[in-house]
Amino acid sequence: MNEKTRIVEYGKVIDPSTMVEPPDAAELELEPGHPGLGDAGYVQRREALFALCRRHRLEGLGPPLIDYTSEETRIWREASSRLDLLHQRHASRIYLEAKRALGISDREIPQLRHMSERLEGETRMHLVPAEGPLPYRTFYQAIANRGFPVTQFIRHGSRPEFTPEPDMIHDCLGHVPPLMNDDYAELLTLIGKAATTTEDGEQVLAFKRFSWFSIEFGLIDEDGDTKIFGAGILSSTGEIPFSLSSEVKRTPFVTDEVIATDYDPSRMQDRLFVIPSFGFLRQELEQLVRRLAVPVF
C-alpha cells in the first residue's frame, strides 16, 4: 500500500480495499469488557436472537415478532424513560412527531414488524432484521434498497444506560423515527446506492463520514435553537447533554470539512456539525455524489 492510497479511519492508517470488500454476515462476538460477557443466560439469549434474525434477514422475512422477557422490558422501560425526558427538551421536532406517530412508548418494547409496516406506508422504507452490526457493504446494500437494518436484542441489564454495540434501544429510539421523513429517507437511500456503487475505498470513507456526522451525530437548527436528530446522540443519556455543552465544537455543516474529519466511535464526540434542514442535507449529498462521479443518477 503506497502513500497515495493510504487513508485514515478512527485515527489509524488502513488499507482502502477493506472498505469495498464483498458483503458478509455479522458475527456474534462480545468484546472484552462487554457487560454481558460473563452472564451465561444473556449470552444464550443473544445467540438465539442472533440465529433468528439472521434467518429472517437472509430469507427476506422481515423483522420477527419477539416475545420479550420481563427483564428485557424492565431495561427498555428504564432506558427509554430516561431518554424520553431528554428528547422532549433537546430532540428535533421532526424526530418527536415521528416518534409519536410510530406509537413508541417507554412502557412496552415495540415490535419492529409493526413499525416497518407503518414506514412502508409513509416513505416506502422498511426495516431489515439484523443479527448484529453488519459489514459496510451489507449495511449499505440494504439501505440502497430502502431497507434499514435494525437489531432486536436488548443491552445487558447491569448497564441500561450503556451499550458497546448498536442494540434495539439505539436503533428504535435513534434511527427509526427519522425514517418517517421523506428527505431523510431519500438521503439514506442515496448514501446506500453511492457506497455500494463505488469501488473506491476513499469514496466509501467519505460517505461513512458524511453519515456519521449526520445520521449518527447530526444536529439541526430549528428557529435559532440547536436540536438533535442523530441516532448516536438520541440513544445516549450521556451524549445528549454533552453534544450541546461548551465542550463540543459545533459549526455549520460544510461537506468538504465533514468528509475530511476523522472520528473515534469509542469516545464522546466533541466535534459536531449543524444542518439547517434535511432538504439541505439531501442536496449536499447529491452534489457530493456528482462531484465524485459515482454513477447512481
PLM regions: where:
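The feature captures two recurrent sequence modes
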Residues: 1-179, 258, 270-297
